[in-house]
């Protein structure tokens, strides 16, 4: 039996991309999974696909009341909460400082930070009492932009750097009761959208980046799928496999940190 059997897991943005892959993985592990999802259509799809194995709540991660409503339903259903995974986010499609009008930069900043930073903070606030009671964990989705420039524009990159500070502070404030960590995936096949303020709410990340382009820049030379990144979340959630890690950010970048100056990777001819 999996050590995550009957663990109560709450994931935001579980309707597509990495969030959906996490929903699938934790259900496979026998966990009781809940998600807060903005799209009514995706909520309906989750309920149809997973039935009683998913508690899908329609709501906005920028609204504390929506979080609290979801947590109340989770506690009614499961009696506990073991892990909160803050995952819902938006990207800025590499919108640069120079090419973004000042008024758009301001509104885009507030929209993107509301989702990518405030959304995590509100989720942590709503989940903290239940996680303190269960001595559980929080995990936040970062990005390669939390370590490197060029993984987005200044808005997105700043939001992911802010999230690393949030992880460290929450890990400090909630220790020893709650472990708080992050996972930073690189580019992958997903439906990640951009801020409405930048005119990007209907534009998917895959309209800006091709599989070939992503694979070419990665030393491991493959185009990642969302399921490729679920392992670190499973490990960090597990009490058996992770008693010692808190305030840690796992950089799941397919080797970007060891990309060479002369070549992407030295073993391409092996």
UniProtKB/Swiss-Prot annotation:
The record's GO molecular-function terms, alphabetically, read:
2,3-dihydroxy-2,3-dihydro-phenylpropionate dehydrogenase activity
Q: What is its EC number?
A: 1.3.1.87
Q: Which SUPFAM superfamilies match?
A: NAD(P)-binding Rossmann-fold domains (SSF51735)
Write out the residues that bind substrate.
143
> Pfam families, from UniProt?
adh_short
The reactions it catalyses are: 3-(cis-5,6-dihydroxycyclohexa-1,3-dien-1-yl)propanoate + NAD(+) = 3-(2,3-dihydroxyphenyl)propanoate + NADH + H(+); (2E)-3-(cis-5,6-dihydroxycyclohexa-1,3-dien-1-yl)prop-2-enoate + NAD(+) = (2E)-3-(2,3-dihydroxyphenyl)prop-2-enoate + NADH + H(+)
The superkingdom listed in its UniProt entry is: Bacteria
Q: Does the keyword Oxidoreductase apply?
A: yes
Coiled coil regions in record: none
Q: Which pathway is this protein engaged in?
A: Aromatic compound metabolism; 3-phenylpropanoate degradation
What residue intervals traverse the membrane?
none
Please tell me whether the keyword ATP-binding is annotated for this protein.
no
Recorded hits in InterPro entries, A to Z, give:
BphB-like_SDR (IPR047950), Dihydrodiol_DH_HcaB (IPR023643), NAD(P)-bd_dom_sf (IPR036291), Sc_DH/Rdtase_CS (IPR020904), SDR_fam (IPR002347)
Q: Which residues bind NAD(+)?
A: 10-34
Q: What are the positions of the active site?
A: 156 (proton acceptor)
Tell me the Gene3D superfamilies matching this sequence.
NAD(P)-binding Rossmann-like Domain (3.40.50.720)
What keywords are assigned to this protein?
Aromatic hydrocarbons catabolism, NAD, Oxidoreductase
A single GO BP term for this record reads:
3-phenylpropionate catabolic process
- What functional role does this protein have? Converts 3-phenylpropionate-dihydrodiol (PP-dihydrodiol) and cinnamic acid-dihydrodiol (CI-dihydrodiol) into 3-(2,3-dihydroxylphenyl)propanoic acid (DHPP) and 2,3-dihydroxicinnamic acid (DHCI), respectively.
Record family assignment = Belongs to the short-chain dehydrogenases/reductases (SDR) family.
Query: Which HAMAP family does the UniProt record give?
Result: HcaB
User: What is the official name of this protein in its record?
Assistant: 3-phenylpropionate-dihydrodiol/cinnamic acid-dihydrodiol dehydrogenase
Which organism is this entry from? Escherichia coli
